[in-house]
Structures are given as structure tokens and as C-alpha cells.
């Protein structure tokens, strides 16, 4: 970046993790849990200078003495005071920048309520005094990151899963589907089925261990029934995992039973359609003329699409639902855990994007509603 060209900041706020960094970089510099913790009791130790709140990794490590809150539920901000703390932490502690010196690109969930985008805009200009800002839809950024402007994105993170059909860079709101089943639910489910095996995981600390087991050992079976038979008849699918205390546990069919819930939400007692059916339903809500482009450009995005085998299984399931001659292509970029952020980094550094920013002046003239005119 040249001196007169100040780097824009890109902040992707997810339900589970916040990803932040500078436009033009190829990966976020800061990735930390979207958590705000407050002390349960007034200062136990005198003179400790106990803070009234902790954010991210520090909140995670001190969780024994804190009450933890996630300000983003199912992808949508529900607690603005805590959200402000997360942004403050992002700018001042993680990136170490002055927000009044950089344009800021924020991301939002598909179908984010209008009032929420206005509130984000207001906080950026009034609390952080940013010179300019923009709000982009997460799935659209993932599509850009894959080098496309038309396609359907299956974005599954920690708190929510969406299928978002996009045509020429614009999300089609009537066809967006939301599924409240994502990484956090899969971790809970794995805790449950490991308990059935005789291992007890209950506390928040143990939940983090199970999340690690999920990320390291789970995979999606191409044929679930057959995989179950293989698991029953042999020990070839068993893997061992060493817990922090040195105990070694063995995990078998749980490895693929856990992510199978994405395709069969009934495993979690949910009546919803699986991710394959949801994707298909989303495509069917679109104009018949663009369906071919969506089938051929189905892009996976988000941490909960990182399971090995998920792309092949999606290919198989959607092929079974789609018209027989349809060409179906599932794109699973290796960096898809961060593709929303990467798409934001690409967008904010395009020369053609520079006139798209909402400036402080425009905000002062029009108020928060300017966001609906300039970001869509």
C-alpha cells in the first residue's frame, strides 16, 4: 500500500469467531472467539485492577471467573453493547489501528434486519468515527473469493447455515434459506454421542476439547448406511485422541455420525431439511433460466463445510435431486473457512469499489438509512 492510500479494514463478525485484518492481505491477521465475558463476582483480589469485561481469547482463558456471552446469535447481532466491545477489541487490541483513519468493511448475515444494518452504520460513524464504511453480505463475499459473480453459496459457520443464490453479484432474497443448524450444534451432538460411549463431556472447557475432536477427526460419509456397517464389522474407522490430561479415548462411528446431522437434521430432533435439500429448494425458488448456472456453481463456505468428504456427498445428493441431465459442480476452496473475509479483502481493494464506500459526510447528511441505498 502506498502512503496516501490507507488500507481498509475488513471485519467479518461470525457467531463463533471474528475474523479481522487489512484489505489486500490474503488472510485475516486476527481470528478470535466472538465472546464477551464479565466477572461473576466483584474483585476477589485487591489491587488486581480487574477489568469489567474481557473479549475473545482472554475471556476464553479466564472463563472460570466470568460469565460468557455471545453477542451474535445465529449470525445476527443481538447485543449491541457487547458487539461494540468486540469491535473496540478488534481495532485497538488485535489490529492496533485507529478506526478514525481507515475505511471499514463489515459483513452481515443474509436477511439481516434493516434496523441492524443501520445500527452497525451508526456505531461505526458515531462511536468509532470511521471516515468511511460499507456493509457486505457474507455469502456474496465468499462467491467473490471463488472468482465468481453468479452461483449459490452454502455458508455454514458456528451459529447458522444459509443457502444464498447470487446472480451477477446480487443475492436473491426471496430464495435465501436459513437453517439454524451449524458448528455449535454439531459440537453439542458429538458431546452427546461421546457420552453414550461412556466418556463424559459437560463443562465449557470440555466442550472446547470436543470441538477440537470434531475438527480433527470427523468426516462426512459418502454412503451413511454402508459406513455404519463398516464401522460395526471392523475397527478400520477407529481413531484415538489424547485428552489434555493424557487419557486416550477411541472414537469410531461418531466420526461420521456427527456431521451426518447436516444432511439429516432429524439426528438432532429437528424437522428441517438437510443442507442438500435446502440447497435444492433454494435453487428451485429461482427463475428457471438461472438454475443451470446455480447448479454448476455451488460454492461451499464457512468452517462447518471443512469436513472431509462433504463436497462429494453434496455432489451425490444434489445429483439425485436435480434433473437427470443437469451439470452439477460443487466448489470447495481449501481456504473456505475464511472465504468471507478473503472476499471482503478482495472487494475493498478493488479500484472500482472505491466510489461505493459510505463516507462520513454522506452519513452526516442522510443518517443511518444511507446504508440501504448504498449497500445491497
From Swiss-Prot:
Q: Which UniProt keywords are present, listed alphabetically?
A: Acetylation, ATP-binding, Cytoplasm, Cytoskeleton, Hydrolase, Methylation, Nucleotide-binding, Oxidation
Tell me how the protein is altered or processed after translation.
Oxidation of Met-45 and Met-48 by MICALs (MICAL1, MICAL2 or MICAL3) to form methionine sulfoxide promotes actin filament depolymerization. MICAL1 and MICAL2 produce the (R)-S-oxide form. The (R)-S-oxide form is reverted by MSRB1 and MSRB2, which promotes actin repolymerization. Monomethylation at Lys-85 (K85me1) regulates actin-myosin interaction and actomyosin-dependent processes. Demethylation by ALKBH4 is required for maintaining actomyosin dynamics supporting normal cleavage furrow ingression during cytokinesis and cell migration.
GO MF terms held by the record: ATP binding; hydrolase activity
Is Ribonucleoprotein one of the keywords UniProt gives this record? no
Query: PTM Tele-methylhistidine: at which residues?
Result: 74
Query: Residue positions of the PTM N-acetylcysteine?
Result: 2
> Which EC class is this protein assigned?
hydrolase
GO-annotated cellular components: cytoplasm; cytoskeleton
State the family it belongs to: Belongs to the actin family.
EC number, as in UniProt: 3.6.4.-
Q: Which residues carry this modification: N6-methyllysine?
A: 85
Q: One Pfam family, short name please? A: Actin
Taxonomically, the superkingdom here is Eukaryota
Q: Could you tell me where this protein is found in the cell?
A: Cytoplasm, Cytoskeleton
Q: Briefly, what is this protein's role? A: Actins are highly conserved proteins that are involved in various types of cell motility and are ubiquitously expressed in all eukaryotic cells.
Reaction(s) catalysed by this chain, per the record, are: ATP + H2O = ADP + phosphate + H(+)
Give all N-acetylaspartate modified positions. Answer: 3
Protein name, UniProt field: Actin, cytoplasmic
* UniProt modified residues of type Methionine (R)-sulfoxide: 45, 48
Q: What is its main location?
A: cytoplasm
Amino acid at each position: 500500500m502506498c502512503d496516501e492510500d490507507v488500507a481498509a479494514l475488513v471485519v467479518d463478525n461470525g457467531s463463533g469467531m471474528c475474523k479481522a485484518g487489512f484489505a489486500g492481505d490474503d488472510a485475516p491477521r486476527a481470528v478470535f472467539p466472538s465472546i464477551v465475558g464479565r466477572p461473576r463476582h466483584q474483585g476477589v483480589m485487591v489491587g488486581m485492577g480487574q477489568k469489567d469485561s474481557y473479549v475473545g481469547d482472554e475471556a476464553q482463558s479466564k472463563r472460570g471467573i466470568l460469565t460468557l456471552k455471545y453477542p451474535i446469535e445465529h449470525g445476527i447481532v443481538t447485543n449491541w453493547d457487547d458487539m461494540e466491545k468486540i469491535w473496540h477489541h478488534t481495532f485497538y487490541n488485535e489490529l492496533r489501528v485507529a478506526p478514525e483513519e481507515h475505511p471499514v468493511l463489515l459483513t452481515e448475515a443474509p436477511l439481516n434486519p434493516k434496523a441492524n444494518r443501520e445500527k452497525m452504520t451508526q456505531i461505526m460513524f458515531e462511536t468509532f468515527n470511521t471516515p468511511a464504511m460499507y456493509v457486505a453480505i457474507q455469502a456474496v463475499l465468499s462467491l467473490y473469493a471463488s472468482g465468481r459473480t453468479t452461483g449459490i453459496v452454502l455458508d455454514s459457520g458456528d451459529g447458522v447455515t444459509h443457502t444464498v443464490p447470487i446472480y451477477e453479484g446480487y443475492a436473491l432474497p426471496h430464495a435465501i434459506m436459513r437453517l439454524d443448524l451449524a458448528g455449535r450444534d454439531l459440537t453439542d451432538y458429538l458431546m452427546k454421542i461421546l457420552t453414550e460411549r461412556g466418556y463424559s463431556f459437560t463443562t465449557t472447557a470440555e466442550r472446547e476439547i470436543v470441538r477440537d475432536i470434531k475438527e480433527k477427526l470427523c468426516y462426512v460419509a459418502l454412503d451413511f448406511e454402508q459406513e455404519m456397517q463398516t464401522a460395526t464389522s471392523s475397527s478400520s474407522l477407529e481413531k484415538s485422541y489424547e485428552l489434555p490430561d493424557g487419557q486416550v479415548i477411541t472414537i469410531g462411528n461418531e466420526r461420521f455420525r456427527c456431521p451426518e446431522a447436516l444432511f439429516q437434521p432429524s439426528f438432532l430432533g429437528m424437522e428441517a431439511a438437510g443442507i442438500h435439500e435446502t440447497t435444492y429448494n433454494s435453487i428451485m425458488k429461482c427463475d428457471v433460466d438461472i438454475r443451470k448456472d446455480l447448479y454448476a456453481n455451488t460454492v461451499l463456505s464457512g468452517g462447518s463445510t471443512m469436513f472431509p468428504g462433504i463436497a462429494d456427498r453434496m455432489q451425490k445428493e444434489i445429483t439425485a435431486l436435480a434433473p437427470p441431465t443437469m451439470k452439477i459442480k460443487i466448489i470447495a476452496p481449501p481456504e473456505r473457512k475464511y472465504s468471507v473475509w478473503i472476499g471482503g479483502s478482495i472487494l475493498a481493494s478493488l479500484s472500482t469499489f472505491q466510489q461505493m464506500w459510505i463516507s462520513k459526510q454522506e452519513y452526516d447528511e442522510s443518517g443511518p438509512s444511507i446504508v440501504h441505498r448504498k449497500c445491497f
